Amino acid sequence: MRRIELTLRADRSFPVPDSDGYQVYGALLDALDTVDASVSQRVHDSPLGTIHNSGLRGSFAGSDRPHHKRVRANEPYGLSLGVVDRDDEELFETLVNAFVLDGDDIRLAEGTLRVESFESSNATHEELLERASDVGSNATLDVEFHTATCIEEAGEVTTMFPHRVSVFRSLLGKWNRTAPEELALDIGREAIAGSVIEKPDPRAYDTHSVLVNRVENGDGGTRPLFRQGFTGQCSYAFKNASESVRNAVTALGMFGEYSGVGSAVARGCGSVEVGLE
């Protein structure tokens, strides 16, 4: 799995939606399409979303337009992209070609951000499990949910709270769909519920409704599709957890920085930063 960290900068100020991940996703597809149309189409069609896109991270100005903010001129913005499918080395290389070798920009609806710097990191599922096994038994996972995290519980019902079962079961599904068969994790709801305690920071908690797609109406037009989710900070501590459960949950937490948490991660949702204490 790979993670790409881009630093972006705009020459002029321009508006972007409050939930800018959807626009960034479209810009990424456009950039991929200029290099390899088949890869772009596969990303668009993938049920996993294939990539995790953090959306723009940085300091924004206010906007007169409803539900918008403004990119500041000459202000640095971060963009994190994660690729977790082991078959997607091609995708990673295509992104490198688009943004580094070809000097491409992120072209949004109202303006452009140029790529100023680029860093990449990689890991395997096995390496994350090895790192997790080195963590002490009293460790705490500190998770910052940077963008709206939309976890579907049943049908179209989404959770609006960073509950331990919801968060780590979401990550477990992503892990087992992308890991080699011999590294699949078998950890049930009861094990997570009985071994992990979540401690959210009420001062940082917020809820959101964000645009993630546009779908066709019966009359040939389109309508916006929204997802509901939460942002904030939450610590996850262990209580009487077995070593296997502790290692699995810790590895899943680290995996979340590559995969994102919940649904619509390719469109800017579920971007997290994880620390260990």
What are these regions (language model features)?
Residues 1-277:
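RNA-interacting cores
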